[in-house]
Regions:
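ABC-type ATPase nucleotide-binding domains, specifically the catalytic core motifs of the NBD
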Residues: 12, 92-110, 118-121, 215
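The feature captures the beta-strand-to-loop junction immediately N-terminal to the Walker
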Residues: 32-34
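Helix-to-loop junction immediately C-terminal to a conserved catalytic motif
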Residues: 47
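Conserved ABC transporter NBD signature motif
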Residues: 55-64, 75, 108-110, 213-215
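Conserved ABC ATPase signature
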Residues: 129-133, 137
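A short, proline-enriched helix->beta-strand linker immediately N-terminal to the Walker B motif
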Residues: 148-152
């Protein structure tokens, strides 16, 4: 379980998040809000890409507030940032392998097979340069790379931004599938409220860095 208590975070001397507190259990938790609400700042803070100015973050009863990003990953939390971070000159398989450097060879092979099971389109393009993929395909590779860490929790920061309707629907289907089949908790920030609510167990709405609403999804 992820437990967030009164966190304050931002960039330099500017606080973007103001005393946020919530828990993520074994569920899909959607974080909604307009541009500038603090969604990306929250995701980067939870992944320990941004420092805390106040408050604490605990995962599985361990304080991870002072963790570095690699320690968070080793703890079982995978982060898929909004920015397209695939390496265009590497193949799809090579991009996926980057996400599994902390695992031994046998587990890496097993995770690669599982990723291909979830994303058959990725398997068909495994030897293709990532730079030739569409935006939707690239995002699937980024998601797959997060799965390659064999995580217990995945943080997805606005993963459908800029995707075509076809890939938006497909992506949300994969999120639900992975949660159910892989026993993974998922925290997803989104502007596409309708789709996110369809798959979420709980919903949080951020407004100017504060929690405006927090409730079970309908």
């Amino acid at each position: 379980m992820l437990t967030v208590k009164d966190i304050v975070s931002g960039y330099g001397d500017v606080d973007v998040l103001h005393k946020l507190s919530f828990e993520v259990k074994h569920e899909i938790y959607a974080v909604l809000g307009a541009n500038g609400a603090g969604k990306t700042t929250l995701m980067k803070t939870l992944a320990r890409w941004l420092p805390l100015n106040n408050g604490t973050i605990e995962y599985d009863n361990e304080d991870i507030s002072d963790f570095e990003p690699y320690q968070t990953a080793a703890k079982g939390i995978a982060f898929v940032p909004q920015e397209n971070n695939v390496f265009p000159d590497l193949t799809v398989r090579e991009n996926l392998s980057i996400g599994s450097t902390l695992l031994d060879k046998k587990v890496r092979k097993q995770m690669l097979e599982e990723v291909y099971d979830v994303f058959p389109d990725i398997y068909e393009r495994s030897n293709q340069k990532a730079g030739t993929l569409s935006g939707g395909e690239s995002q699937m590779v980024a998601f797959g790379r997060g799965l390659m860490q064999n995580p217990k929790m995945i943080l997805l920061d606005e993963p459908t931004a800029g995707l075509s309707p076809k890939y938006v629907g497909m992506f949300f289907e994969k999120v639900k599938q992975i949660h159910l089949e892989k026993d993974v908790s998922i925290l997803i920030s989104e502007q596409n409220a309708t789709k996110a609510i369809e798959i979420a167990d709980k919903v949080m709405v951020l407004q100017l860095g504060k929690i405006h609403l927090m409730e079970d999804a309908a």
